[in-house]
A protein has these predicted regions:
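C-terminal hydrophobic helical "lid"/dimerization subdomain
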Residues: 1-4, 8, 229-232, 281-329
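N-terminal glycine-rich cofactor-binding segment
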Residues: 8-26, 42-74, 94-97, 118
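Mid-domain Rossmann-like dinucleotide-binding core that forms the NAD(H)/NADP(H) cofactor-binding site
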Residues: 124-199, 204
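Glycine-rich cofactor phosphate-binding loops and adjacent beta1-alpha1 units
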Residues: 141-143, 189-266
Length: 329
C-alpha cells in the first residue's frame, strides 16, 4: 500500500490552528489526491471561532477539538486502492467530503470526489464544491423571466446565486448585505440594486420597488435570524422562499406569513443529496461557469501558502469582506 506524508491543518481549539504531519495510507478503497488549491468555507470560519457543527452524516469525525479541518479543494489523483474502479492516477478531481483537505495531500473514498468537467481551470475546479452548490441553488431557485429576486447575503454563494438569477431572466436582482465592499462587488457583477440593513429599511425598499407586492423569489444566503425574518417579510403572496444557508444554531422566526401567504419553500443544498445525484448535478451546475456566463474569479479575494494557514484564518476571522480566501500547498 502506498504511503504519503503530508502537512495538514489541525484545529486544537478556538483560533488555535497549526500544521501537523500526518501519514496517509492508501487502503484498498482509498484515493490519495495531491491538492492544487484549498478554500476557506463559511463553515470553516465558524469552526475557527469555536462553533463546531452538530453531529450529522456529513461528518465522519466527531465534531470536537482537536478537529481535522477542510473540505473545499481539488487536485490530481496520485494513488488508488486495489478496489477503486472510478478513478485512476492522473485524474483531476474536486473534493466533496470532509477529509482534512487543508493539506498537501488528502485521502478520500470514491463517493467523496467528483471528476473535473469541461476542462475547467484547476483554480476554479478546486472550488468546485462551493461553486456547484451555489450554482445548484441558483438553477433550482424557481426564478422565471421577469421576476424580482432578492439575495440575502453577498458572500461567495450569494454573489454566484445573484449572477445566476440574472442569467435566468430576472427583471431585477437585489443583493442585501451589511458590508459595502460586498455590495460594490455585487453591483460590478450585475446586481441592479444593493441594500445595506445598517443604512436602509430593506422591507420598505423592496415594497417600494415592487409596488407593495414583494419579491417573487428571495434566496436566504446569509444564515442569520435577522436575514430569515427579513426574507419572510419581503416575499410576495405565493412567492418562493429559497433556502441555501447552513444554520447551526437555533433561531427565532416569525412564521405566520409562511402559512397565511402560502409561501413556497425550496431547499437548494446540493451537498445533502446522495453522491449519485451529485454526479448528475455537478456538471450541470458548473457548465455555465465553464461557458463564462457566471464569473467566479473576482470572488477569490486573498491567497496564502499553506504554511501561512494561521494568517489566512486570522484574516477570515477579522475581515468579512474577504469573500474567498485560498491556500496553495
Amino acid at each position: 500500500m502506498d504511503t504519503f506524508v503530508t502537512k495538514a491543518a489541525r484545529l486544537n481549539g478556538p483560533r488555535d490552528i497549526e500544521l501537523i504531519e500526518r501519514e496517509l495510507v492508501c487502503g484498498e478503497d482509498d484515493i490519495i489526491v495531491k491538492n492544487h488549491l484549498m478554500g476557506i468555507c463559511g463553515s470553516d470560519k465558524n469552526f475557527y471561532r469555536g462553533y463546531l457543527p452538530p453531529k450529522t452524516a456529513e461528518f465522519r469525525q466527531d465534531p470536537k477539538f482537536p478537529f481535522l479541518l477542510g473540505h473545499e479543494s481539488g487536485g490530481t489523483v496520485v494513488a488508488v486502492g486495489s478496489r477503486v474502479a472510478d478513478y485512476k492516477v492522473g485524474d483531476r478531481v474536486m473534493a466533496f467530503g470532509w477529509n482534512n483537505n487543508f493539506a498537501e495531500y488528502f485521502a478520500a473514498k470514491s463517493f467523496q470526489l467528483q471528476p473535473v468537467p469541461y476542462d475547467l481551470d484547476m483554480d476554479i475546479a478546486s472550488l468546485g464544491e462551493p461553486i456547484s452548490c451555489a450554482m445548484y441553488s441558483g438553477l433550482n431557485s424557481g426564478v422565471q423571466l421577469g421576476d424580482t429576486v432578492v439575495v440575502m447575503g453577498g458572500g461567495f454563494a450569494g454573489q454566484i446565486i445573484a449572477q445566476c438569477a440574472r442569467r435566468k431572466g430576472a427583471y431585477r436582482v437585489i443583493v442585501v448585505d451589511v458590508l459595502e465592499g460586498k455590495l460594490a462587488l455585487a453591483r460590478r457583477l450585475g446586481a441592479d440594486i444593493t441594500l445595506n440593513p445598517g443604512q436602509d429599511d430593506v422591507i420598505e425598499a423592496v415594497k417600494d420597488l415592487t409596488n407593495g407586492l414583494g419579491a417573487d423569489v428571495v434566496v436566504e444566503a446569509a444564515g442569520t435570524a435577522e436575514s430569515f425574518n427579513t426574507a419572510s417579510e419581503i416575499i410576495k403572496h405565493n412567492g418562493k422562499f429559497v433556502f441555501y444557508s447552513w444554520v447551526t444554531t437555533p433561531v427565532t422566526l416569525n412564521i405566520s406569513r409562511w402559512h397565511d401567504d402560502g409561501l413556497e419553500f425550496i431547499n437548494t443544498c446540493l451537498v445533502h443529496h446522495t453522491w449519485q445525484q451529485r454526479y448528475v448535478w455537478c456538471p450541470e451546475a458548473l457548465r455555465p461557469v465553464a461557458q463564462g456566463l457566471v464569473d467566479v474569479k473576482p470572488l477569490i479575494t486573498d491567497e496564502f501558502k499553506l504554511d501561512d494557514i494561521k494568517a489566512g484564518f486570522d484574516l477570515a476571522d477579522k475581515d468579512d469582506a474577504a469573500i474567498k480566501i485560498v491556500f496553495r500547498p
